[in-house]
């Protein structure tokens, strides 16, 4: 029987550090971090995510400004809004909820965010710095993943790691963070052959494909650290890529869904905006 990686408990450790940071800034009469979150349209998933971010931010003493825009907003109007936030000294972090409506060029719009306020690491500037190993904001979900693995006090150096999924938001940056820790990384995707055999040999498995119940106990070994990034709503319940009840009986460590990676992500976002002030 393996151990559960408790994302909520690990997240609380970072929250305690954030509260300490905020209290110290208040004592010194310094600015309190403020996040501006932009949502275009009324996508239910995005609204839930934003409301959760706001709730967590404010509970930690972070100011959170929610900006909700009609789906019909013109691209130039959205850019003008972002440019205004860029020069607003009271705003320290800008988040643009994706996806955007089809009539808006997401790549163009995200490029307009000031790289120093790009706490979700969407701009090409921060992406380039990240992959070159220069100081930059680390994407929130990959940062959550690597910190959860490190919380186990396992030496990542030399470990065989498999990342299933090659998205620019999760898969690729997670692979890069594992490389930075000197793991030997294999990125798998929908065209990968013999996926089950590849995973069986891995010390670390990160699944980020959004296919509920895809990873069974046949994919893991007794030493596997399994990180489930999948979040798919099935019959009103959130489900991960991993068949948790099966895999926990065989692998060494497994993250639950919910209560694993997702519990860390918003905290990492807030950590990024705090670091923007340092």
Curated annotation (Swiss-Prot):
Its EC number is 1.5.1.5, 3.5.4.9. The lineage of its organism: Bacteria, Bacillati, Bacillota, Clostridia, Eubacteriales. It comes from Clostridium acetobutylicum (strain ATCC 824 / DSM 792 / JCM 1419 / IAM 19013 / LMG 5710 / NBRC 13948 / NRRL B-527 / VKM B-1787 / 2291 / W). It catalyses: (6R)-5,10-methylene-5,6,7,8-tetrahydrofolate + NADP(+) = (6R)-5,10-methenyltetrahydrofolate + NADPH; (6R)-5,10-methenyltetrahydrofolate + H2O = (6R)-10-formyltetrahydrofolate + H(+). Catalyzes the oxidation of 5,10-methylenetetrahydrofolate to 5,10-methenyltetrahydrofolate and then the hydrolysis of 5,10-methenyltetrahydrofolate to 10-formyltetrahydrofolate. Belongs to the tetrahydrofolate dehydrogenase/cyclohydrolase family. NADP(+) binds at residues 165-167, 190, 231. This is Bifunctional protein FolD. SUPFAM superfamilies: Aminoacid dehydrogenase-like, N-terminal domain, NAD(P)-binding Rossmann-fold domains. NCBIfam families: PRK14172.1. The gene is folD. GO terms for cellular component: cytosol. Pathway: One-carbon metabolism; tetrahydrofolate interconversion. GO terms for molecular function: methenyltetrahydrofolate cyclohydrolase activity; methylenetetrahydrofolate dehydrogenase (NADP+) activity.
